[in-house]
Regions:
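Basic, helix-initiating cap at the start of DNA-binding domains
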Residues: 1-24, 28-40, 54
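Amphipathic alpha-helical packing segments from all-alpha helical-bundle domains
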Residues: 83, 119-145, 157
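Hydrophobic alpha-helical connector segments
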Residues: 58, 72-103, 155-162
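Short hydrophobic/aromatic patch on the recognition helix
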Residues: 38-49
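C-terminal peripheral helix-coil segments that are non-catalytic and often amphipathic
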Residues: 88-95, 130-142, 146, 165, ...
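Hydrophobic/aromatic residues within well-ordered alpha-helical segments
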Residues: 52, 63-67, 81, 88, ...
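Base-recognition residues in the alpha-helical recognition helix of bacterial helix-turn-helix
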Residues: 22, 47-50, 58-62
Length: 189
C-alpha cells in the first residue's frame, strides 16, 4: 500500500506543478514555487523525484499527454483524412481555453526555452514535434490515396504549415491576450 500512496503523491505533485512549469518555464520556476504550490517540503519533492530535472520532465510529459491524447482520439474518431485534419482543429478550438489557462502549448514553450539552455528538453520537444508532423503527413498521404486530398499537395510542406498555423495562432493569442487571432487562423485553415 505505501507504493500506492507514493504514486498518488507523485501524481498530485505533477498535476499541481505542471501548469507552473508551463507558465513560468523550467529556468524561472524556483523550488519555492514548487513547495508553495504543493505544500510539501523540499525533501518531500526530491524524495519523490530526485531532482528538479526529473520533476520538470514528468510535468512536461503530463502537459504534452493531454495534447497527444487529443490527437489520438481525433484520429480514432474520424475515418476520413479531411475529417481527421478538421477534427484536430476542432480539438484545439474546443480546448483553447484549457491550454491557454495552463500557460499555452507546452511543446512550444519547452521548445523555445530549451533551445537556449537544455539539450535534453530540446531533443524531447523535437521528437514530439517530428512525430506530430509524421502523423499529419500520414493522414495527408492516406487522403491522397483515397482521392480526398489533391495529389499535388506536398504532404511534408502542408504538415509544417498546419502545425505552424496552430502554434503561431496560440503564440499570437497568448502574446496579445486576444484569442480572436487564434480562432481566425484556425477558421481559415
Amino acid at each position: 500500500m505505501p507504493f500506492a500512496k507514493s504514486e498518488r503523491t507523485k501524481k498530485r505533485i505533477i498535476e499541481t506543478v505542471a501548469p507552473i512549469f508551463n507558465k513560468k518555464g523550467y529556468q524561472s520556476t524556483a523550488l519555492s514555487d514548487i513547495t508553495n504550490a504543493t505544500g510539501l517540503t523540499k525533501g518531500a519533492i526530491y524524495g519523490n523525484f530526485g531532482n528538479k530535472e526529473s520533476l520538470a520532465e514528468a510535468c512536461f510529459n503530463h502537459n504534452v499527454k493531454f495534447l497527444q491524447k487529443g490527437l489520438q482520439m481525433t484520429w480514432a474518431a474520424h475515418p476520413s483524412s479531411i475529417d481527421k485534419l478538421t477534427g484536430l482543429l476542432n480539438f484545439y478550438e474546443q480546448n483553447f481555453e484549457t491550454v491557454s489557462n495552463n500557460g499555452g502549448c507546452p511543446l512550444m514553450n519547452v521548445a523555445v526555452e530549451a533551445d537556449d539552455f537544455h539539450p535534453f528538453f530540446k531533443e524531447k520537444a523535437k521528437t514530439i514535434l517530428l512525430n506530430w508532423k509524421s502523423e499529419i503527413v500520414s493522414v495527408i498521404r492516406e487522403g491522397q490515396s483515397s482521392g480526398e486530398i489533391k495529389p499535388e499537395i506536398r504532404a511534408q510542406d502542408f504538415a509544417n504549415f498546419y502545425i505552424a498555423s496552430i502554434e503561431g495562432g496560440i503564440l499570437i493569442a497568448k502574446t496579445t491576450n486576444d484569442s480572436t487571432a487564434f480562432f481566425n487562423i484556425i477558421e481559415n485553415l
